[in-house]
Amino acid sequence: MEEMSPDNIHGVILAVSSSIFIGSSFIIKKKGLKKAGVSGARAGEGGYGYLYEPWWWAGMITMIVGEIANFAAYAFAPAILVTPLGALSIIFSAVLAHFILEEKLHMFGILGCVLCVVGSTTIVLHAPHEQGIESVKQVWHLATEPGFLAYSAVVLVVVLALIFYYEPRYGKTHMIVYVGICSLMGSLTVMSVKAVAIAIKLTFSGMNQFKYFHAWIFIIVVTICCILQINYLNKALDNFNTAVISPVYYVMFTTFTILASMIMFKDWASQSGLQIATELCGFVTILSGTFLLHKTKDMGNSTSLRGSTSHSPRDTPVFINSGSSRSSNSTRPAIL
C-alpha cells in the first residue's frame, strides 16, 4: 500500500463530504416527489409538478452542494479514488430512508452496506496517485484518443436506445432502464467534470485555461449530461425504492466511471499487478454488498405489508425486473 499523497487526502475529504450531502438529497427530493405526486402527475409519468415543491428544491440544493464538493475532489484525486466513496451516500441514504420514508432496511441490507464500505475502503487505500496535468489541452488530447472516442460512441448509442425504445416500454417496471441512462451519461459527466475542475484549479494557480475552447466544450458536455441525469434520476426515484436505487445506481455509475477513467486517463498504467488485483477485489466486495441488498430487498417490507391494509401497492419496492407489480397503480391516486 502506497502512502497517500496530499492531493489524494484532499480528494478523499471532499468526496466524503459530498457523499453525506448527496445521500441526504435523495431522501429530501423523494419527500418532494411524494408531495407533488398527490396533487398532480408523478415524475415517473412525465409530470413536472415537483418543480413547484419546496422540498424538492431543498433536495436539489443539498445535492448541488454535494456535487460541488465532489467536483472539487476530482481536481485533486483520480476518479478511481473519488468515485467509489459514493458508497457512503448509499449508507446515509438507506438509513434515512429507513427512518424517514419507512422504506425498511433488513439486517442483511445493513450487511450489504457494510460490504460496500469495506470494498470502497480497500480501493481508496490502494488507489493510484493523480497524474500531473498542466493544461486543459492535455486533457483534450486524452479525450480525443481513439480508445475514449470509441467508448463515448458506444455510450451514446446505448443511451439513445434506452431513451427512445426501452424507456417508453419498460421504464416503469425495470429500474435498470433509468439507472442505466444515468450511469452511462454519468461516466461521461465525470470525465468532463474532471477536465473542468483541472481547468479551474490551474486558472486559480495563474494559468488561465478558459482562453482555450477545449474548456468550454467540456462545460457544454457537463451541462447536457447533468440535465439528462437529473430528469431520469427523478423518474427512477419516483417509481422505485430509494434504498435499492442508491446502491444499484452507485455500482453501475462506479463501474462505468472507472472504465472510462481507465481508458481516458490510464489510471492503472503506473500500478503493479498486485495493486490492481487488490482494487478489483475491493470492487467485487462492493458488488457483493449490492447483490445482498437486492436479494433481501423484500425482507424489511413483508411484515409491515401483512400487518396493515392501509399501505399503497407503491410502498412495495420494485426493482430491476418487476413486470407484474405495477398494474394496480393506474386505478388509485398517485401516492408514493
UniProtKB/Swiss-Prot annotation:
One of its GO terms (molecular function) is magnesium ion transmembrane transporter activity. Residues 321-330 have a biased composition (Low complexity). Acts as a Mg(2+) transporter. Can also transport other divalent cations such as Fe(2+), Sr(2+), Ba(2+), Mn(2+) and Co(2+) but to a much less extent than Mg(2+). This is Probable magnesium transporter NIPA2. It comes from Arabidopsis thaliana. The keyword Magnesium applies. Keywords: Cell membrane, Endosome, Ion transport, Magnesium, Membrane, Transmembrane, Transmembrane helix, Transport. It comes from the Eukaryota. Belongs to the NIPA (TC 2.A.7) family. The chain crosses the membrane at residues 8-28, 56-76, 80-100, 105-125, 146-166, 180-200, 213-233, 245-265, 273-293. Homodimer.
